[in-house]
Curated annotation (Swiss-Prot):
Expressed in kidney, colon and skin. GO terms for cellular component: bicellular tight junction; cell body; cytoplasm; cytosol; membrane; protein-containing complex. This is Serine/threonine-protein kinase WNK4. The gene is WNK4. PROSITE patterns: PROTEIN_KINASE_DOM (PS50011), PROTEIN_KINASE_ST (PS00108).
Length: 1243
């Protein structure tokens, strides 16, 4: 019968947790006697419910715990008298426990105190038996069961925390079911790295809203982030795909950050101390600088205080949540990336760069300085967007108290991203500078040019040094680009000036000061460039600034450490073989084409912008040109291409150019510039233009397009699609293509007549050979990096030499492109004609010099502008044929004709003629002059020989009779009757041309011819004889040698004359150093089987004849620019004359080829050699097109063999394109090709 009351008592006990905590123990009844029978039912708290409260184990546990806590004070509580209870007949009242009494109730009766005691302390042995009766044992079991259950749950919880619920695919990382964070699209659990026993963060990212492409992009970003290790970047350990609750997710294992974020810190402390703000802001900047300096740069795009984590033990901060902006894009449906309060204005347009992280950093600093969320006054993102785009700052900006912090924040959150601070600027700011007790200062004023700087090292604590210095500064010299801060600090430690413990602070202080100086110099240089730019870009006059041959000033190294990767390519001088030029120079480089940074002689001088040297291509050049400068012209290098695009009439070198291009010290985000150039034009079947593009990633792309069938938009779209040009370069590319098309069509229309004759003589297999051209920067106001050159010259143009402009310094054709020789923008028109040696006269302001020393000797001679008709004096009357004797080779010095162009677009070029000189001999047409000018260096591309190509200069329009083969000259000097005889002179310094006895020499026709007008040019002749032009029958090029004519070149001139015709050593030096032009008559170097070379003896060389070069190319010999031609009033007459004169000389082509072939056979017969099979006359070889090789990795020798149009005869030795000559000297690298020598023992 007592079971029911016991059950009810247990329920009452479970409901008394609050009552027992608030009330003292109840007193006894009114009479002081214990009540008999079942106790009255206690009124329930929720009396409205009829049914009792259901049993709950959880409720029972809580009651037992609370009762156990209350047992300490409920038992000793003394009874207090209470008001008397109502009678028993009354309704049920609250149960009250009687006080402890000495009177024991009878067995079987119920006491109110027993259950309470049992509940409070069930382990008391002194409890009376009535307390543990049948009705009170059930309550005693409740606390025991609860304690056991609690212990069991505790163990289960511990097991759950120590037992992994998931593992990584490789088993290294474990996941525990302990959630430590949750975001909008990620959940973070605690994990463990079993290899290092370090706790990690296990992040599960939801990617169900991402598309397939976005998911792939995110995976790539995560893979990229794995390799990042920086003390201020949260470390990424691993990532993989996993299936969670039936959905694919990405798991990231990152470094565990348990001390919260900057956001939680601000919520807790509300205000951040300035020193903490300084330290943490500097650490954030370092982390951002590390991300932005990667290649390619890594952008955070969602930087805010919630993503900056605090490392508790060290008190440093780390940037986290990298790469999650891709997920956030899809997580917020159509919204943009990032948090609106921290988003830069350009983020809304999704056209951004590293500047967006600078903007977000400024907002983070604003929140740290004010403990107020930016734009908290705005109600929604739309209001924030309006304030951000309108340039209004958040209201909290005006609450910043520290002026320096306010200045930094203002510089970071500017609307224009170009006006914001950069990460480097912020790190160099005085507010973020660390106080390490070490200061480095400038000991002298920096002029921005000196490579060496005097610096002072000051240390605050005088006792820190190894020697007592009384806190005096240590002065030392630091060479920019050569010294390293660590090396300087190590030297100080070794000398005892600095303690070893101060090595790191000193090195860091020096490094930071040097970096600040370099940044300052860079800003000043950019400011000077902007000031020097003209208001409206226009075609400036063509200028060729001259620089001294051997540069004496070493240029400073790139200013930024990161600038090394932007260092422009410099090319070694004379490292290109003309036989391999089709492959090598088209790709702008060869196996020996890179300039070592340690080669000071080949580095541009400090005053010359390095961008001018980035495209210096050193090639066997034909001429040294000096084009007049009307003012302080801009410096420009002909760099990437080795031919002038002026000859095609498409020169746009100077269009849109400023005074100089950007120097190599660039921003980290600068990309390499692209270059576009025209290599050939043909209208044989279709009007096709072939161009070559150097892409932004230094790849060479050759493409052709039809003038009639392809539109510029289609070409640009294809280039962008194939990633040959950047989207930002598309507009500039379109402008260049349109300009190319317009100019090509203009030239094609003008030359339809003359070219019809050329097409008739072309063989079906011949195609116009591509011709390298000058790179031309695009006048793009948007700072595009695309450059183009629209040259249409023939491929046979190897180069024209650019000489430096320092007066008095001679030019050496052997080193035509010294790296310090910039070329200013402007139309450059190389008028290539046979080499000559004009005497000093006002009509020859420039001359090419031949020196046995191939070191650079640039000439400086300004070209005067002339308002009169351009002069083109080239008389042939004093140019006798050169011949090669069989015995010791004497020096032949034919008189030379001089070409002087007074037109500003035509630099005067010295030229000689290998035509027979007679008073009645008609001059060649001006058409052939232009044609031969373009074809002068044709053999250097086919199979070059050092020397000068002797070709006919322009002649007045008169019929040219067939030239008979001259009879050989006897060894004794006797000369058979012939109108064409070489003028023989001694090996010593040749005297001026004068009449000689008929037995030995022919009397000169005339000392000096009267000027003759040919078209728009005046042709005159010079008195001074030229160097001999020995014949080179089997070589595609026949070399001669020009002689210097400027007054300041007397010593070099005499040296050349002494060495011109003498022994093999002098002739080898002459051949090695003379690259100014190449002729049809040259000495042929032939080696016998026994290693000795037979000397040529006996009769003089047969006549060499000019080549009909107009048969060999299409529209590549047009030497007049469209701008110059359009400005002249005599264009129509000039072009009509060209057409007629070309027709007249077509008949001579076959005669010349026949004569030359016979001359080669006669030479072999005189030498006692068997003529090689397939002899082709040099004039005929010019017409054979060179094979174009793919940009494969052929060895140089293999390329030489692949590109030879004709196999060389027996005994011909080919020089390696890398070694240059047997001496292997660097100065002689330009001399490679096929040559014959008259010496016996020399290789």
């Amino acid at each position: 019968m007592l079971a029911s009351p016991a059950t009810e008592t247990t329920v009452l006990m479970s409901q008394t947790e609050a009552d027992l905590a608030l009330r003292p123990p109840p007193p006894l009844g009114t009479a002081g006697q214990p009540r008999l029978g079942p106790p009255p039912r206690r009124a329930r708290r929720f009396s409205g419910k009829a049914e009792p409260r259901p049993r709950s184990s959880r409720l029972s546990r809580r009651s037992s715990v609370d009762l156990g806590l209350l047992s300490s004070w409920s038992l000793p509580a003394s009874p207090a008298p209470d008001p008397p209870d109502p009678p028993d007949s009354a309704g049920p009242g609250p149960a009250r426990s009687p006080p402890p009494s000495s009177k024991e109730p009878p067995e079987g009766t119920w006491t109110e105190g027993a259950p309470v005691k049992a509940a409070e302390d069930s382990a008391r042995p002194e409890l009376p038996d009535s307390a543990v009766g049948p009705g009170s044992r059930e309550p005693l079991r409740v606390p025991e069961a609860v304690a056991l259950e609690r212990r069991r749950e505790q163990e289960e919880k511990e097991d759950m925390e120590t037992q992994a619920v998931a593992t990584s695919p490789d088993g290294r990382y474990l996941k525990f079911d302990i959630e430590i964070g949750r975001g909008s699209f990620k959940t973070v659990y605690r994990g463990l790295d079993t290899d290092t026993t370090v706790e990690v963060a296990w992040c599960e990212l939801q990617t169900r809203k991402l598309s397939r492409a976005e998911r792939q992009r995110f995976s790539e970003e995560v893979e990229m982030l794995k390799g990042l290790q920086h003390p201020n970047i949260v470390r990424f350990y691993d990532s993989w795909k996993s299936v969670l609750r039936g959905q694919v997710c990405i798991v990231l294992v990152t470094e565990l950050m348990t001390s919260g974020t900057l956001k939680t810190y601000l919520r807790r402390f509300r205000e951040m101390k300035p020193r903490v703000l300084q330290r943490w802001s500097r650490q954030i900047l370092r982390g951002l600088h590390f991300l932005h300096s990667r290649v390619p740069p890594i952008l955070h795009r969602d930087l805010k205080c919630d993503n900056v984590f605090i490392t508790g033990p060290t008190g440093s901060v780390k940037i986290g949540d990298l790469g999650l902006a891709t997920l956030k894009r899809a997580s917020f449906a159509k919204s943009v990336i990032g948090t609106p309060e921290f988003m830069a204005p350009e983020m809304y347009e999704e056209k951004y760069d590293e500047a967006v992280d600078v903007y977000a950093f400024g907002m983070c600093m604003l929140e740290m300085a004010t403990s107020e969320y930016p734009y908290s006054e705005c109600q929604n993102a739309a209001q924030i967007y309006r304030k951000v785009t309108s340039g209004r700052k958040p209201n909290s900006f005006h609450k910043v108290k520290i002026p320096e912090v306010k200045e930094i924040i203002e510089g970071c959150i500017r609307t224009d991203k170009n006006e914001r601070f950069t990460i480097q600027d912020l790190l160099a700011h005085a507010f973020f500078r660390e106080e390490r007790g070490v200061h480095v200062e400038l000991a002298e004023e920096d002029d921005g040019e000196k490579p060496g700087l005097k610096l002072w090292l000051r240390m605050e604590d005088a006792r820190r040094g190894g020697r007592p210095r009384d806190n005096q500064a240590i002065e030392f010299l630091f060479q920019l680009g050569r010294d390293a801060a660590e090396e300087v600090a190590q030297e100080m430690v070794a000398l005892g000036l600095v303690c070893e413990a101060d090595y790191q602070p000193v090195a860091r202080a020096v490094r930071e000061r040097v970096a600040a100086i370099q940044r300052k110099r860079e800003k000043l240089r950019k400011a000077r460039e902007l000031e020097a730019l003209p208001p409206e870009p226009g075609p400036p006059p063509a200028t060729v600034p001259m620089a001294p041959g051997p540069p004496s000033v070493f240029p400073p190294e790139p200013e930024e450490p990161e600038a090394d990767q932007h260092q422009p390519f410099l090319f070694r001088h004379a490292s290109y073989s003309s036989t391999t030029s089709d492959c090598e120079t088209d790709g702008y480089l060869s196996s020996s084409g890179f300039l070592d940074a340690s080669d000071p002689a080949l580095q541009p001088p400090g005053g010359v912008p390095s961008s001018l040297a980035e495209s210096h291509l050193c090639l066997p050049s034909a001429f040294a040109l000096s084009i007049p400068r009307s003012g302080p012209g801009s410096d420009f290098s002909p760099g990437d291409s080795y031919a002038s695009d002026a000859a095609s009439g498409l020169s746009d070198v100077g269009e849109g150019m400023g005074q100089m291009r950007r120097p190599p010290g660039r921003n980290l985000r600068r990309r390499p510039r692209s270059r576009l150039r025209v290599t050939s034009v043909s209208d044989q079947n279709d009007r096709v233009v072939e161009c070559q593009l150097q892409t932004h990633n230094s790849k060479m792309v050759t493409f052709r397009f039809d003038l009639d069938g392809d539109s510029p938009e289609e070409i640009a779209a294809a280039m962008v699609y194939n990633e040959f040009i950047l989207p930002s370069e598309r507009d500039g590319f379109l402008r260049r293509i349109r300009e190319i098309i317009q100019r090509v069509e203009t030239l094609l229309k003008r030359d339809t007549g003359p070219m019809e004759a050329a097409e008739d003589t072309l063989s079906p297999q011949e195609e116009p050979a591509p011709l390298p051209a000058l790179p031309v920067p695009l006048p793009d106001p948007s700072n595009e990096e695309l450059q183009s050159s629209t040259s249409l010259e023939h491929r046979s143009w190897t180069a024209f030499s650019t000489s430096s402009s320092s007066p008095g310094t001679p030019l050496s054709p052997g080193n035509p492109f010294s790296p310090g020789t910039p070329i200013s923008p402007g139309p450059i028109f190389p008028i290539t004609s046979p080499p000559c040696h004009p005497s000093p006269s006002p009509f020859s302001p420039i001359s090419s010099q031949v020196s046995s020393n191939p070191s650079p000797h640039p000439t400086s001679s300004p070209l005067p502008f002339s308002s009169s008709t351009p002069e083109f004096p080239v008389p042939l009357s004093q140019c006798p044929w050169s011949s090669l004797p069989t015995t010791s080779p004497p020096t032949f010095s034919p008189t030379c004709s001089q070409v002087t162009l007074s037109s500003p677009f035509f630099p005067p070029c010295p030229s000689t003629s290998s035509f027979p000189s007679t008073t009645a001999a008609p001059l060649l047409s001006l058409a052939s002059a232009f044609s031969l000018a373009v074809m002068t260096v044709a053999q250097s591309l086919l199979s070059p020989s050092p020397g000068l190509l002797s070709q006919s200069p322009p002649a007045p329009p008169s019929p040219l009779p067939s030239l008979p083969l001259p009879p050989p000259v006897a060894p004794g000097g006797q000369e058979s009757p012939s109108p064409h005889t070489a003028e023989v002179e001694s090996e010593a310094s040749p005297p001026p041309a004068r009449p000689l006895p008929g037995e030995a020499r022919l009397a000169p026709i005339s000392e000096e011819g009267k000027p003759q007008l040919v078209g728009r040019f005046q042709v005159t002749s010079s008195k001074e004889p030229a160097e001999p032009l020995p014949l080179q029958p089997t070589s595609p090029t026949l070399s001669g040698s020009p002689k210097p004519s400027t007054p300041q070149l007397t010593s070099e001139s005499s040296d050349t004359e002494d060495s011109a015709g003498g022994g093999p050593e002098t002739r080898e030096a002459l051949a090695e150093s003379d690259r100014a032009a190449e002729g049809l008559g040259a000495g042929v170097e032939e080696e016998g089987d026994d290693g000795k070379e037979p000397q040529v003896g006996g009769s003089p060389q047969p006549l060499s004849h000019p080549s009909p070069v107009w048969m060999n190319y299409s529209y590549s010999s047009l030497c007049l620019s469209s701008e110059e031609s359009e400005s002249s009033g005599e264009d129509e007459e000039f072009w009509a004359e060209l057409q007629s004169l070309r027709q007249k000389h077509l008949s001579e082509v076959e005669t010349l080829q026949t004569l030359q072939k016979k001359e080669i056979e006669d030479l072999y017969s005189r030498l006692g050699k068997q003529p090689p099979p397939g002899i082709v006359a040099p004039a005929a070889m010019l017409s054979s097109r060179q094979r174009r090789l793919s940009k494969g990795s052929f060895p140089t020798s293999r390329r030489n063999s692949l590109q030879r149009s004709e196999p060389p005869g027996p005994g011909i030795m080919r020089r390696n394109s890398l070694s240059g000559s047997s001496t292997g000297s660097q100065e002689q690298r330009a001399s490679k090709g096929v040559t014959f020598a008259g010496d016996v023992g020399r290789m």
